């Protein structure tokens, strides 16, 4: 008999078991482990909740990827799954077969179910199955570890949604034996009180990405700093909208000192995004010097950088290996750009993405950074649109990109000579100027995706972040 035949028989046996729920529950301890996933899917689909509850207690794999089955929250099924786990946690001695360590609520492991489904099992060799079982059967060592529940948290409302509220309450009830692990936490509009409750529930070491879009209340800033300092594995920090109030110098210094002390504890931070946060103005040096590890990404956008802030950027080793730099909407019109040139020279070997969108950079300031920009040989994305730039300035800029052969996306403003008195593009004027710019560019290198003018093409509506069928989108026409 072939390997496929007994596999199919096992599936049929599992389906027949579900017709007799009492029998299915009674034989779970003797059920072959390879039958658990297809039987679980069948029970999930047919909503045999009591079977699911008992199957969780006998689950023979380290991870139960429930999130890839449950595309939308189902509180009834969640209650039964959690009840099954609670029954086990209440036992001093766990069953022999139970290996569950992780309840995965993110939609990240659909491959698990397809591998163990009939279609994929038919194509699996006995050797491959044996190898997979060997890896998953590795015994745990040491003391009993807490069960980990993995889920991402995106807070778009003032209050918690039902599934997050359910897990939060369960974790608080089972504190110590269950950890709520969230690699990504995003807060758009949740109130301070509810957000504090979330941060107190989530296991802080699990958070790798934290985005706060409403840092407008001073009390939130202070509260946030206290929790942030516990997130030792944080890799990405995004904070936005901290400019609602005019602060006294004492309050500003207090907030900067608070954040500085937090940054000292974030040893794994790699990406720092600061958007529309004005209390850093004039104090950026104090923050940058507290970074413990080299950053890969630095974004200071919609801010009001002072010249002293820009001067500090090339000084510190933590910014010497940048891959992404974004100073868009940074009002650089009245700031000397020699420090930016020094920073670009420092990161020329590593920089891959540079955003200088709508920074008020005219030709005189552009000339300051062009020599350094031309040495950024690994640059793949360069966005410069939104600046008031003449035709001569754009010609000079394009000629300086001759050695940037890795550029795959570049955006530039329409030349000033193609605009009306309200700053709107006149296509009849832009078309010949654009053709001339492309001719100059092709003399030094062959571009891939390039935009001149507004970010969205007025002819085809394409934005620079979309995949284009043609090599170029020059107002909807291949160049």
From Swiss-Prot:
One of its GO terms (cellular component) is Cul2-RING ubiquitin ligase complex. LRR repeats lie at residues 15-38, 97-124, 179-203, 204-230, 231-265, 266-291, 292-323, 324-342, 348-375, 376-400. It comes from the Eukaryota. The keyword Magnesium does not apply. The keyword Repeat applies. Keywords: Leucine-rich repeat, Repeat. One of its GO terms (molecular function) is ubiquitin-like ligase-substrate adaptor activity. GO terms for biological process: negative regulation of apoptotic process; negative regulation of cell differentiation; negative regulation of DNA-templated transcription; positive regulation of cell population proliferation; proteasome-mediated ubiquitin-dependent protein catabolic process. Disulfide bonds: none annotated. InterPro entries: LRR_dom_sf (IPR032675), PRAME (IPR026271), PRAME_domain (IPR050694). Belongs to the PRAME family. This is PRAME family member 18. It comes from Homo sapiens (Human).
């Amino acid at each position: 008999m072939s390997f496929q035949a007994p596999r199919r028989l096992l599936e049929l046996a599992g389906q027949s078991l579900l017709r007799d729920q009492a029998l299915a529950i009674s034989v779970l301890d003797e059920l072959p482990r390879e039958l658990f996933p297809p039987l679980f899917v069948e029970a999930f689909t047919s909503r045999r909740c009591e079977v699911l509850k008992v199957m969780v207690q006998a689950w023979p794999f380290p991870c139960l990827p429930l999130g890839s089955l449950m595309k939308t929250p189902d509180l009834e099924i969640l209650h039964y799954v959690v009840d099954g786990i609670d029954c086990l946690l209440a036992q001093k001695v766990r069953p022999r077969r139970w290996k569950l360590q992780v309840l995965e609520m993110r939609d990240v492991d659909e491959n698990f179910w397809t591998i163990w489904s009939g279609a994929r099992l038919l194509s699996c060799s006995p050797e491959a199955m044996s190898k997979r079982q060997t890896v998953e059967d590795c015994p745990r060592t040491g003391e009993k570890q807490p069960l980990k529940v993995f889920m991402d948290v995106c807070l778009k409302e003032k209050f918690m949604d039902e599934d997050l509220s359910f897990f939060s309450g369960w974790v608080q009830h089972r504190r110590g034996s269950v950890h709520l692990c969230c690699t990504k936490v995003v807060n758009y509009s949740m109130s301070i009180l509810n957000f504090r409750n979330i941060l107190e529930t989530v296991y802080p070491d699990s958070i790798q990405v934290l985005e706060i879009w409403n840092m407008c209340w001073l009390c939130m800033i202070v509260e946030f700093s206290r929790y942030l300092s516990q997130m030792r594995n944080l890799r990405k920090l995004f904070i936005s909208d901290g400019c609602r109030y005019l602060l006294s110098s004492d309050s500003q210094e207090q907030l900067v000192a608070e954040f500085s002390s937090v940054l000292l504890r974030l040893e794994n931070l790699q990406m720092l995004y600061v958007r529309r946060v004005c209390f850093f103005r004039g104090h950026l040096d104090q923050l940058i010097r507290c970074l413990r590890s080299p950053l890969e990404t630095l974004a200071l956008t919609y801010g009001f950088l002072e010249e002293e802030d820009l001067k500090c950027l090339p000084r510190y080793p933590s910014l010497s290996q940048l891959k992404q730099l974004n100073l868009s909407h940074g009002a650089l019109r009245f700031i000397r750009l020699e420090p930016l040139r020094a920073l670009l020279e420092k990161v020329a070997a590593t920089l891959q993405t540079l955003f200088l969108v709508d920074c008020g950079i005219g030709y005189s300031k552009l000339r300051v950074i062009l020599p350094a920009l031309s040495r950024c040989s690994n640059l793949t994305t360069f966005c410069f649109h939104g600046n008031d730039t003449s035709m001569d300035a754009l010609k000079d800029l394009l000629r300086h990109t001759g050695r940037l052969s890795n550029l795959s996306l570049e955006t530039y403003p329409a030349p000033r000579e193609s605009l009306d008195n309200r700053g709107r593009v006149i296509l009849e004027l832009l078309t010949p100027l654009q053709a001339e710019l492309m001719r100059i560019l092709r003399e030094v290198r062959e571009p891939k995706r390039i935009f001149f003018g507004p970010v969205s093409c007025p002819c085809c509506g394409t934005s620079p972040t979309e995949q284009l069928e043609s090599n170029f989108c020059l107002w909807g026409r291949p160049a």
